[in-house]
Amino acid sequence: DIRLRGWHLGALLVQVLGFVLFAGLAAITSDGAGRILLECTMICLICPCAAAAGVITRKLDGDLAATVSYLCLTNLAATFLIPMVIPMIRPASDLGFWAYVLRIALKVFPVLVLPGLLAWLIRYTTHKLQRRLMRFAPNSFYIWFIGLTLAMVLATHALFMNYPGGWALAGIVAVSVATCALQFFLGRRIGKGRVNSITAGQGLGQKNTGFLIWLGYNYLTPVTSVAGGLYAIWQNL
């Protein structure tokens, strides 16, 4: 039952408008702690929904299909928006604007869109393989736990490799906590009824933090990757 729900648009607008707003502020802010915090905020907002959100949603008796639908929406939105916005904030010295947009798009597409396309291809063309893979569905919680462990490792690595100093770290902690709590809260408010409230909260709040760390480290101020590592911790508390 993969289809659009009423809360999808509201949740997506929170991510997109928040990202564009803070990206605009970052673009007109000079380098320093303030710009780092703005960059942390914008990537914590636009980061797509985590695949693990479906596992948590199912455990909480939410709507798994609605979470998967929102996962696809956020991946598509991030795939188109990020390559357009990042070059305005951190232009490449060796490439023009559109060439840099294309480079980022080619990096983002395999990470966010290709797995979804592969899943759809398997679902509609190779039913035997799909049935075999579906046998692992009851073990999805354990796969999520492994993913959580890896996210914690990435968080620790990001912190040690990009330690920003005490005050800057305190600011990044505050931003990551605030964006995490706000998105879970807004998601629950946007979703109407118990099931939609749970589902929208998980869809908007649970992030693909591995992608968040990768994005910050490679295309923004590298220390912003620490926000992704910290977000991985807060979203699972």
What are these regions (language model features)?
Residues D1-L237:
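Alpha-helical transmembrane segments of multi-pass small-molecule/ion transporters
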